[in-house]
Amino acid sequence: MTDVSAPTGGATSPVDITASPGSTALPPVATTSAAASASSSQAKPLTNGAKKAATAAAAAGAEEGGASASNQVKQEQRRQSNNNRPAASGTPEAKQATPAGNPDPGAGSTSKSSSIHTQTSQQERAGRPTSSASQHDVDEVARLFEEKPEAFEKWLTERAPPEALGRLQEFIESRKPLKRPSVTSDLFQQWMAASPTVQQKSPRSLSNSSASSIPESRRHLMDLDEGELFMELIRDVANELDIDVLCHKILVNVGLLTHADRGSLFLAKGAPNNKYLVAKLFDVTQKTALKDAVTRASTEEIIIPFGIGIAGMVAQTKQMINIKEAYKDARFNCEIDLKTGYKTNAILCMPICNYEGDIIGVAQIINKTNGCMEFDEHDVEIFRRYLTFCGIGIQNAQLFEMSVQEYRRNQILLNLARSIFEEQNNLECLVTKIMTEARELLKCERCSVFLVDLDCCEAGCGRVGGAMRRFGVRSKQVSAIVEHVGGRRGNTSHLEKIIEKPNQPATRAIKSADSFEEKKMRNRFTVLFELGGEYQAANVSRPSTSELSTSTLAQIAQFVATTGQTVNICDVHEWVREHNQIRAESEIDSTQAILCMPIVNAKKTVIGVAQLINKANGVPFTESDASIFEAFAIFCGLGIHNTQMYENACKLMAKQKVALECLSYHATASQDQTEKLTQDAIADADTYNLYSFTFTDFELVDDDTCRAVLRMFMQCNLVSQFQIPYDVLCRWVLSVRKNYRPVKYHNWRHALNVAQTMFAMLKTGKMERFMTDLEILGLLVACLCHDLDHRGTNNAFQTKTESPLAILYTTSTMEHHHFDQCVMILNSEGNNIFQALSPEDYRSVMKTVESAILSTDLAMYFKKRNAFLELVENGEFDWQGEEKKDLLCGMMMTACDVSAIAKPWEVQHKVAKLVADEFFDQGDLEKLQLNTQPVAMMDRERKDELPKMQVGFIDVICLPLYRVLCDTFPWITPLYEGTLENRRNWQDLAEKVEMGLTWIDHDTIDKPVEEFAACADEEIKDIEFTVTTLNCNQSQQSQHGSEDSHTPEHQRSGSRLSMKKTGALGKAVRSKLSKTLYNSMDGSKPKTSLKLLESHVSEDMDDKSPTSPSQPQAAGSMGRMSASSSTSSAGGQGQCQVAAPGQAQDKSKKRSKLCALL
């Protein structure tokens, strides 16, 4: 280290500009550039902040040179032992000012800086001190930094000598705050980044190289006074976190402070009420190496209970003991002196406490080395003061060691968690891995796991037999009854004290000896996993009855399985004597301590027992060991439980496969049916009326429905286009029909009608021009399969009842099931109509089928409707994009699914009755099973509201859909027109219900409307109604009128007419009718008859224009109510024709022109 003196203002002031031993002096001109050197060395421009920092650094350098010169010289003189003193003055050549009028300040600065560094280097090589810069030089450099920072940067990068840069860097480092290396971060990061081999070792092994360096620098430390030495030794241990290195430093440093010959350090261990001391390092001198001290302490472990010996007494009383003559003190143990030949004279033993005042260790020093025979008061005070700081360091080191152990424990548990899923099909490997990790972490000699076979236990206990059989263990099914024992009877027995954790209050009891023996005889273990030493492989065996009855370890395990409690046995011999067990001498002699814990499953049922046998250091298992071992037991239980679940899942999958095979066999059409359909002649499409939107299946028998499906495939040229074998197609159609349940509406015939509507939309509606052949195939398949295996209940019912389907599919429950059934049939042997498709085409058609079937969920319809309407409003006409095509197919599927609403009235009202009956059946189930009130459309008690609900269904779903479709594709207008016509019919019936009529009193919907009936020769006591059909001619009405005249009274309940309700009848007609009826009832003979009613109706109709848009429903209503009305048979519909023929022709012409234009 070099001191530099420079005259300033005529005075001589020495300045020390270095901060570390061995560094070289740096001229102040160079040091003023400290703030800019870091950035300039990397050739980056200086920012304004850098400029200001450089200026501040220059000023600080000058101030430091003047203000702290004397203190630095004193420190330098103390540290220098070679009498190297600084010169009193510097050379005048060291000073150099900037030439006046220099046109290039930057160049001047460069020249000046170069000159200064050159002179400094020459002076140092010549052994002469350098001179300090004047304040004027500092100001010039600061101004130069502000005006021309690029010039200084250029000089640093291009012309500065390496020596100057090195000194500049040293000066920057010296200006930084003093920072001692932190062992916390370095040690922990080193340990985490180390290889697995290093991680398995204690983290203290990484710090062996960083052992105390005090013996090497002893001469230097001896030159310090007592106060400085004390502080230096405190710094030496302040940041040390490796417990072994720390203890070694403490003993060596204490020897330096007190001139003690050797020392020992004991750390407190054990539970709060069972404390003992463990010799961390013993008999350490100032020349003892750390490795030797640690090795000796680990091989010759010394354990001293509190209150025993000198160290034990200090730990118990927390009082210092200073013995002048050890051999005269009864507490002194001279055995070690006799073994080593060393004679102990003076002993100073002092406790080490933490900030709470608890004992964490005891330090002991022996014999003085400076000729004194005893430790005086000064030694005691120094010892006490130093140990106060050492207590903080020891506690920090212990906390660090605990954090490292916790980190490793967490890593092990994380690996075990991964192993649970990696080894879920191999219980032996999983249990062996868990035992290996537990043995290494807890440092025990042996580890065992007993598994209980629960085949004969109560339901819910689980199984492990199948998992055991997978690794070759053939065990008998032995029941194990595990009972938790509660309550305490009498005083605590000696047995209970022994099996508790060491010196812990007994908290567990058994009911009686007989009860315990009885349970023990019933508990049997079927599998035993044993893991011995480090290089021993795991042993898996099936213990016999005799082995279980004679093995002490098995007896302890049975006790734990019976009570379900953890036991920590510190004296196995005492446990054996207490239980009068048959000794297995080899087993007992080698067993000292046992930690035994139950393994439970998710239902808290004991499925096994885990045991740890003998700690490696011979001490009992602690409460901390039990806590760690509990985590291993939990993971072991999770692994066994997961293995059981995996086994059960495999079994269930196997059962499902068998069930699917059986289902596939029974769900597939027979060979005889297939051959018969294959040989049948298929009529043309016109025979089945397939091209018409008014198609009905009422006239078709079951075989005809299959033939009609085949005809649709043929007409679309799908059989030849995709090379579908004809027998495969026939078998598939029959299998699809077979997989529909015989529910009232969502059955095979509904699927046929949906498929026919799709066929009519593609052919008659000319929508096939927007579809590829593969998409047409997918749409027809989807229509036929869209309600496969329908149960007659909707998605909401599946969710309410928490059915397996609802658990399997959370959204669109039934639709997903329909698609799965479709896939199941296609995968059945001889039913794959897609077998000739390429993989790409197969994926494409299956995607179309899935999307189309899921689109039949009305929730999906409402989700897609707005996007579809937006495309239509924007004038979309191509429909070839993937998303556009998906939207179009979804709307088409919904239109086909509800197409019954557009059928002719005689078909529609029958289908509505079927839908209503199916809904009412679901409502009955909701009342019976769920005890809830169903919605109106499923409530049988509100059946009269069905016409009104039909009108709402048409208005909300059907009409908006068909309107936008026919606006875009005018060839499907019949669907829209048919829906409008049926809406008028349903609205008419809804008005009848409001008048008090009942439309659905009968088992079938053939006679939905009630009419007036009166006999001329009988007195009218009330207005009676008879039921006639809607689609009937005059002869049919008269026939039905004669039949209904014999209808019993109880079948005509609710047939009173309420004149207070408004309906289709005009106000004038109701008034006239009311007056006529009541006037006729006042006479002896009534004059009311059907003709009288007809006359009033005719008068009312004559008063209104037949083309009025607001009256067709009323006219139609009265036409159906009049038995002899001439309009009742018009069109075979029983409705009054209110539109002129010319108007219909005009509409037809306009529609034809629009179609031709498109």
Swiss-Prot record:
Residues covered by the PDEase domain: 670-993
Cofactors, names only: a divalent metal cation
Lipidation residue positions, type S-farnesyl cysteine: C1155
Database matches in Gene3D superfamilies: 3'5'-cyclic nucleotide phosphodiesterase, catalytic domain (1.10.1300.10), 3.30.450.40
Enzyme Commission code: 3.1.4.35
Residue span, GAF domain: 242-394, 426-640
InterPro entries: GAF, GAF-like_dom_sf, HD/PDEase_dom, PDEase, PDEase_catalytic_dom, PDEase_catalytic_dom_sf, PDEase_CS
Details of cofactor binding: Binds 2 divalent metal cations per subunit. Site 1 may preferentially bind zinc ions, while site 2 has a preference for magnesium and/or manganese ions.
Propeptide feature: residues: 1156-1158
Keywords, in A-Z order: Cell membrane, cGMP, Hydrolase, Lipoprotein, Membrane, Metal-binding, Methylation, Prenylation, Repeat
Catalytic activity: 3',5'-cyclic GMP + H2O = GMP + H(+)
Matches recorded under Pfam families: GAF (PF01590), PDEase_I (PF00233)
Biased composition (Basic and acidic residues): 1041-1052
Biased composition range(s): Basic residues: 1148-1158
Biased composition (Low complexity): 30-71, 202-215, 1114-1130
Binding residue positions for a divalent metal cation 2: D787
One Gene Ontology term from the biological process aspect of the record: signal transduction
Biased composition range(s): Polar residues: 108-135
Active-site annotation: H746
Residue ranges, annotated region (Disordered): 1-137, 195-216, 1034-1065, 1097-1158
Record family assignment: Belongs to the cyclic nucleotide phosphodiesterase family.
Subunit structure: Interacts with PrBP.
Function according to Swiss-Prot or TrEMBL: Has a role regulating cGMP transport in Malpighian tubule principal cells.
Protein name: cGMP-specific 3',5'-cyclic phosphodiesterase
Biological classification of the source: Eukaryota, Metazoa, Ecdysozoa, Arthropoda, Hexapoda
